[in-house]
Amino acid sequence: MLLLINNLILNDVPTPWGLYFQDSSTPNQEGIIELHDNIMFYLVLILCTVSWLLFSIVKDSSKNPLPHKYLVHGQTIEIIWTILPAVVLLIIAFPSFILLYLCDEVISPAMTIKAIGLQWYWRYEYSDFINDSGETIEFESYVIPEDLLEDGQLRLLDTDTSVVCPVNTHIRFIVSAADVIHDFAIPSLGIKVDACPGRLNQVSALIQREGVYYGMCSETCGVAHSAMPIKIEVVSTKEFLTWLNEQ
């Protein structure tokens, strides 16, 4: 118990029987979790109210002194059940519209990473950086086969090459595909964007803590769809520059 209290254990990978979000690492994901919690509050409130009304109707139906066949209309209750749901929907809609706009907005990114989906692996390009040969940094990332996994590596999640990003840096991901539709999704970063052939989609992320984040292709793309993991290592700026010099 003391270990759990004194050490923050963050969840950046899928867990067995998980029923909630992974721990967030970007403002976008924080907003998604907050919106989810707010909507769940209204859903639980509505569920309890409707359940209580249904229980009361069934329980007291035989005690009703006014038979329902003589009840021709109820203007007050009709106004209530028309206006109240509309108000609840508006309360839910406005925050969701704001969050949707913020998630799509990309303003002055510090760097750009291009992710291209192929059957069944990812290719990444760092177009802002050029190596000694005058070429942009690019590499391919494949899932590590189960028989080659080392201790501590995750089945169908670890890759032979990782995307490396600096912490606290505004990063733009440009996502596309070379064959069929894929989907670039990292839950902890609040990223989920379709990778479509012939189209460039973009999303931004401000990753606020170092760590290793896992994602998957979230669009059925063929027989090896489950073998398209995404692994992102977030390091300090100094470590990122060291990694760049090694490429």
From Swiss-Prot:
InterPro entries: CcO_II, CcO_II-like_C, CcO_II_C, Copper_CuA, Cupredoxin, Cyt_c_oxidase_su2, Cyt_c_oxidase_su2_TM_dom, Cyt_c_oxidase_su2_TM_sf. Binds a dinuclear copper A center per subunit. Residues 60-78 are mitochondrial matrix. Residues 12-38, 102-247 are mitochondrial intermembrane. It is found in: Mitochondrion inner membrane. Mg(2+) binds at residue 219. Cu cation A2 binds at residues 217, 219, 221, 225. SUPFAM superfamilies: Cupredoxins, Cytochrome c oxidase subunit II-like, transmembrane region. PROSITE patterns: COX2, COX2_CUA, COX2_TM. Its EC number is 7.1.1.9. The keyword DNA-binding does not apply. GO terms for biological process: ATP synthesis coupled electron transport. This is Cytochrome c oxidase subunit 2. The gene is COX2.
